[in-house]
Amino acid sequence: MQKLLFIFTFIASVAFSAHAQEEFFSAPDFAQIERNIKEPTSSYYHPKLMEKYMAGDEKMTLEEGRHLYFGFIYQPQYMPVDTSAYNNKLAEVLSKKSFTPTDYTSILQYSDALLLEDPFNLRALNAKLLVYAQQNNAEEYKKVAQQRHVVQNAIAGTGDGMSADTPFYVIKVAHEYDILPFLGYNFGGEDKILSSKKVNYLTLADNRFGVERVYFNISPILDHLNARGGGKM
């Protein structure tokens, strides 16, 4: 019970942190980010940032996190859509009411497979945190928690999500859904694209903030798909 309480307390603190940043957001400058992450002498050189991220470096700054997350769209392995079969496999194991040691092993394997495709997969990071909490693996828990913190802050620092003019920016549609709990929300059932603004909104279930929708800018996703002849998200 203490482990679960710790997890929920940590999640709540992240959600509070996201709301506290509402007045301090700025949209990503993709042109500048692209220049910086491709320059080997830059402190924002993407391979260097990825190395810090994978190590769970707590000294990674917000700006470094933004360059890491949004700079990923310029990497050859970037895929804006979910294609891995491990999504369903992970969901199947997580749907169980209780877990065995074998389940924990499977959760870590499936999560790692998903993170190879998308290093910022919040669902996979959360799943790993669940296992490490149950195993009392404080070192790995701390590293993964820092990785999740970097992703959450990179997204939350781009807008307030309250309108199509101040949306949160994401590089993958799945990140929209996965960031909602950290903001204190649950999905309300409707997902709609405003193509003229390259914005997508999700309706929300009843919440203590009285917010009905959250808006996300999905321009990196649409631009990537359009450059390759279109396709489904």
Regions flagged by a language model, labelled:
Residues K96-K97, L114, V131:
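Residue-level signature for tetratricopeptide repeat
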Residues L122-R123, V150-A164:
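Boundary/linker segments of alpha-helical solenoid repeat arrays
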Residues A133-A156:
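TPR/TPR-like (Sel1-like) alpha-helical repeat modules
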